[in-house]
């Protein structure tokens, strides 16, 4: 039985770094908002155990308005240090610590649907509650956007699956695995598989592997480093500084934005992974052109005519934003959102073409640059959101 409850001024959907940060900033500004979601769920349930963050320490803090809920503060309170690179399980624990400190009002419940209303948005919860929100902030992450290459379209998930479908790769013990992809997710998954004693091969389309963080000393040259590198840690020298200023970045011609964004976020592995990849066959410059069941195994045909017979293909094939794939957006609402290649077209305040509907995180990257695809972009997103709402409330 549906239960109609009192309306609210704002709703935040998502309890990862962006949702938690937005809630903390809005609360500090005295702006009412209910926040729904399971804290750090994607990080815990859709990333394999044993992984580490590629971003450096300074770029991995979850932004808060008082700059007090840092990783350093977390370590001091917990009484132990977090190793570098940052282990995934410690980052998840840090996010939950942040939530307990700053967003205790979080409701660990699931939104069923969001639809347009005459004065805002109609919200329906899975548990039957219904209410209207004047404003909706979508910080739901990328879990709805996983890419499954068409070559694997007819292959059952028991034989081919996306990396985001797993929280522990040790389940593949006793099987032979091919990892498709050549970025951080692919390479670290391969390392974890080998360390678990699982035979693995990496197959990537590019002619060579790209790496980040091979020259850490360049980040510790004082004033010189600050000229070329931003503390946000997104992109190489020069580009790093540019993408750290979204309002400046978005003023450049679209072609330049696209080239700079690709250079900042192209598939690449962290330099600290290299020793862990020794002994793993890595086939580059090759593409899987077809995949088919063969008995209880999977046969992969590559574009050079070679074949692989494996027990499972792990698809580290990334994510492609398409906000119409968010299951909680009603079809009629999703159809009204102006988009470009799946990304919502956003204006100041990260607001979509539908007044009062905001998108934070990766969906904001087309409008505001690649910084919004990383934890370090949450400070900009939360600050911009608060400014927009405050400005609008002040004009009413």
Give each language-model segment a name:
Residues 2-39, 84-184, 188-396:
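Flavin (primarily FAD) cofactor-binding/catalytic cores of flavoenzymes
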Residues 44-78, 230-250:
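Flavin (FAD/FMN) cofactor-binding and adjacent substrate-gating region
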């Amino acid at each position: 039985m549906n239960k109609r409850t009192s309306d609210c001024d704002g709703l935040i959907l998502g309890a990862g770094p962006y949702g938690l940060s937005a809630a903390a900033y809005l609360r500090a500004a005295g702006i009412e908002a209910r926040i729904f979601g399971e804290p750090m769920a994607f990080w815990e349930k859709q990333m394999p155990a044993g992984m580490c963050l590629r971003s450096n320490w300074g770029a991995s803090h979850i932004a808060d308005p008082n700059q007090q809920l840092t990783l350093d503060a977390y370590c001091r309170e917990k009484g132990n240090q977090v190793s570098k690179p940052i282990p995934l399980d410690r980052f998840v624990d840090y996010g939950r610590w942040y939530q307990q400190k700053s967003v205790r009002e979080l409701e660990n419940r699931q939104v069923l649907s969001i639809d347009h209303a005459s004065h805002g948005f109609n919200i329906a919860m899975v548990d039957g509650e219904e209410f209207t929100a004047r404003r909706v902030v979508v910080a739901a992450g990328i879990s709805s956007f996983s890419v499954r290459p068409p070559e694997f379209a007819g292959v059952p998930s028991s034989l081919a699956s996306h990396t985001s479908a797993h929280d522990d790769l040790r389940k593949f013990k006793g099987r032979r695995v091919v990892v498709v992809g050549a970025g951080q997710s692919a390479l670290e998954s391969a390392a974890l598989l080998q360390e678990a004693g699982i035979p693995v091969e990496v197959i990537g389309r590019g002619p060579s592997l790209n790496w980040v963080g091979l020259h850490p000393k360049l980040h510790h040259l004082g004033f010189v480093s600050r000229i070329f590198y931003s503390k946000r840690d997104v992109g190489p020298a020069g580009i790093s500084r540019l993408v750290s200023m979204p309002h400046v970045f978005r003023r450049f011609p679209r072609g330049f934005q696209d080239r700079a964004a690709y250079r900042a976020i192209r598939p690449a592995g962290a330099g600290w992974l290299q020793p862990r990849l020794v002994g793993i066959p890595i086939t580059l410059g090759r593409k899987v052109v077809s995949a088919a069941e063969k008995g209880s195994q999977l046969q992969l045909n590559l574009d050079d005519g070679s074949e692989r017979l494996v027990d499972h293909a792990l698809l580290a094939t990334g994510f492609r934003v398409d906000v119409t794939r968010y299951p909680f957006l009603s079809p009629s609402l999703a159809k009204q959102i102006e988009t470009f290649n799946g990304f919502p077209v956003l204006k100041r305040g990260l607001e979509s073409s539908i007044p009062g509907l905001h998108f934070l995180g990766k969906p904001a990257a087309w409008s505001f640059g690649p910084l919004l695809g990383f934890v370090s972009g949450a400070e900009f997103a939360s600050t911009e959101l608060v400014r927009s709402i405050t400005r609008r409330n002040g004009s009413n």
